[in-house]
Amino acid sequence: MCCRAGTEQSLSYSDFINRDLIHFSVYDVKRSIPCVVDGFKPSQRKIMFSCFKRNLTSEIKVAQLAGYVSENASYHHGEASLQGAIICMAQDYVGSNNMNLLRPNGMFGSRRLGGKDAASPRYIYTQLEAITNKVRRALISWLLPLAGALRSLRW
């Protein structure tokens, strides 16, 4: 038996897992698995929304872009994980992305170590890739609901 914080009620472990912990598990799955409609995870969708909102045609440090995204797209999971998502979206070695939407400028990782050897986000730069403008109209139609409420899409 365990107790809830601030109460004297007891709660069995099975009740805790089936009623309380399940909410975290569902939320974690939503953050971890890309959406079938656009292929983005919520963090990637917020990155693209912020890049289009800023009209990111010139280079910006990955650390600065992460700060901009967390401020303007209500990202609440820490800038370190956001920086990692930006780095993964810009990787262009064989086997990393089908189509990278962000242009890498600097050491964004290598195939040998699976991208884990990327430089620190304060030393590498990125901007929108040229191909992104070609698919921009389709991406914007999926990202538009973010503009109003600044929250994840619900399909």
Q: How should these model regions be labeled?
A:
Residues M1-W155:
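Catalytic phosphate-handling regions of large nucleic-acid enzymes and associated NTPases
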